[in-house]
């Protein structure tokens, strides 16, 4: 450990120190102020004669007489199964007043991408209890499926709903008591104090905290801390998944705040900016986070990611959602129009996509009719959406009887299937049965994407009769 008192410049969250020998990139630093206070930081840039340090607690009050100690190691997360039920700040320090954490080991937070040769293809279903996801855009264990939202939309409510409702089928059915434990890692970045209180109230009220580890980085915390929080969360998830055989769902919100922190740090370092001022390495940086999801051959556990981001200006071509879409395996869209109609959660299934869905559904996974029901609902709802535009021109009276049924289907799909509130958890059977109720509004010959045997087994004749009477 070497100590310096050679601070040359303090700029925003950065402290620049003259050194007489090279210092390792990402090394942890302690800065001792004249009043004895100690702050932690991390080496952000290292040259032969100086280093740039990002200070986690902020640089206010630091002067040139402060002592800087380089600890010679990168940041590590103390991990143990006892982290479940605990609440940490954005740097991994407990803030819940609980006992001191006694770690089983300390792990480097940067982590490593899973060796492609050792990856197992994601195939098992995760039940979120949300019909628009489970039925139409299924989440699969080991997948990374982002939620694209926008300012003012209830993505936090959806995140909390998934955190308390998510299960794996084998855990729910009790078929396999070993290797099927389910845990949630919740990493919040740049949230307000009000949002933090809302999160904690919900976790404690519903009992979801018992199977969760929560990391909270607040809006008034230093931006550099936001770059640490998701790595702490993922390091904890990897330990629980690959050492303790948990199926871990990692919810990260809001990745836009994370990227804004990257931009702020890049500006402080006077880096050459990329698109819209974001650093040119943002794609690589995001990939380092998202690629930590997956399954490893020979291990029971899995890491599944559900990152949430708000699209600036509702623009899905903005660099943050654009780059996220390249790396991840689909997206769930939160829709402003559906939200204005009072539909909760306001998920628009048409632009949403789960690229791994087809491998995680079907007989032995969800139900044999799942894929056909999903395809037919997509087709019918898309037809109803197109007809809504036509109705604005010619009116409903000019449409055929079948066209009017498609319009009614689209309305009921939003009101009954998508709109389930934030406190209702539906099983996959309930979701698919509701899908059949809606599809039975249409005549059998319109169900051209479903196997005839499945139609005979599940079609409700009474639904068609009720529609005709109406």
UniProtKB/Swiss-Prot annotation:
Keyword ATP-binding: no
Species name: Haloarcula marismortui (strain ATCC 43049 / DSM 3752 / JCM 8966 / VKM B-1809)
GO cellular component, one term: proton-transporting two-sector ATPase complex, catalytic domain
Official protein name in the record: A-type ATP synthase subunit B
Gene name linked to the record: atpB
InterPro entries tied to this protein: ATP-synt_VA_C, ATPase_a/bsu_AS, ATPase_A1-cplx_bsu, ATPase_F1/V1/A1_a/bsu_N, ATPase_F1/V1/A1_a/bsu_nucl-bd, P-loop_NTPase, V-ATPase_su_B/beta
Main location group: membrane
Matches recorded under Pfam families: ATP-synt_ab, ATP-synt_ab_N, ATP-synt_VA_C
GO molecular function: ATP binding; proton-transporting ATP synthase activity, rotational mechanism
Upper lineage: Archaea, Methanobacteriati, Methanobacteriota, Stenosarchaea group, Halobacteria
GTP-binding as UniProt keyword: no
């Amino acid at each position: 450990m070497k100590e310096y008192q050679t601070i040359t410049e303090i700029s925003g969250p950065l402290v620049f120190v003259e050194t007489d020998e090279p210092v390792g990139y990402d090394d942890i630093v302690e800065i001792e102020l004249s009043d004895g206070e100690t702050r932690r930081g991390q080496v952000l840039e290292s040259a032969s004669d100086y280093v740039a340090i990002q200070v986690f607690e902020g640089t206010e009050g630091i002067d040139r007489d402060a002592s800087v100690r380089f600890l010679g190691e990168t940041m590590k997360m103390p991990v143990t199964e006892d982290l479940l039920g605990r609440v940490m700040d954005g740097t991994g320090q407990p803030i819940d007043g609980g006992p001191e954490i006694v770690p089983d080991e300390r792990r480097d937070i940067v982590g490593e991408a899973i060796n492609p040769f050792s990856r197992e293809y994601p195939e098992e279903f995760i039940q979120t209890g949300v019909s628009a996801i489970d039925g139409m855009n299924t989440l699969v264990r080991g997948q990374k499926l982002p939620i694209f939202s926008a300012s003012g939309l209830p993505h936090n409510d959806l995140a909390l709903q998934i955190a308390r409702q998510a299960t794996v089928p084998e855990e729910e059915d009790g078929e396999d008591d070993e290797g099927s434990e389910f845990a949630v890692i919740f990493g919040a970045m740049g949230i307000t104090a009000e949002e933090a209180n809302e999160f904690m109230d919900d976790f404690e009220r519903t009992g979801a905290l018992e199977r969760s580890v929560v990391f909270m980085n607040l809006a008034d915390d230093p931006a550099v801390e936001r770059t640490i929080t998701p790595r702490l969360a993922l390091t904890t998830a990897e330990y629980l998944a690959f050492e303790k055989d948990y199926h871990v769902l990692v919810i990260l919100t809001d990745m836009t705040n994370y990227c804004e922190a990257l931009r702020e740090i890049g500006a402080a370092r006077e880096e050459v900016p990329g698109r819209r001022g974001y650093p040119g390495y943002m794609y690589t940086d995001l990939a380092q986070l998202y690629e930590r999801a997956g399954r490893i051959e020979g291990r029971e556990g899995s890491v599944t990611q559900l990152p949430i981001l708000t699209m600036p200006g509702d623009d899905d071509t903005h660099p943050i959602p654009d780059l996220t879409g390249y790396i991840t395996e689909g997206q769930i869209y939160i829709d402003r129009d559906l939200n204005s109609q009072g539909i909760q959660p306001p998920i628009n299934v048409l632009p949403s996509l789960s690229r791994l869905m087809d491998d995680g559904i079907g007989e032995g996974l969800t139900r044999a009719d799942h894929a056909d029901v999903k395809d037919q609902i997509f087709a019918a709802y898309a037809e109803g959406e197109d007809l809504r535009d036509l109705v604005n021109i010619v009116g409903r009276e000019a449409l055929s009887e079948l066209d009017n049924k498609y319009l009614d289907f689209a309305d009921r799909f939003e009101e009954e299937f998508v709109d389930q509130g934030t406190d209702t958890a539906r099983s996959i059977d309930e979701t698919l049965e509701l899908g059949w109720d809606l599809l039975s509004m249409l005549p059998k010959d319109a169900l051209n994407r479903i196997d005839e045997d499945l139609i005979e087994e599940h079609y409700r004749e009474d639904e068609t009769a009720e529609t005709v009477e109406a």
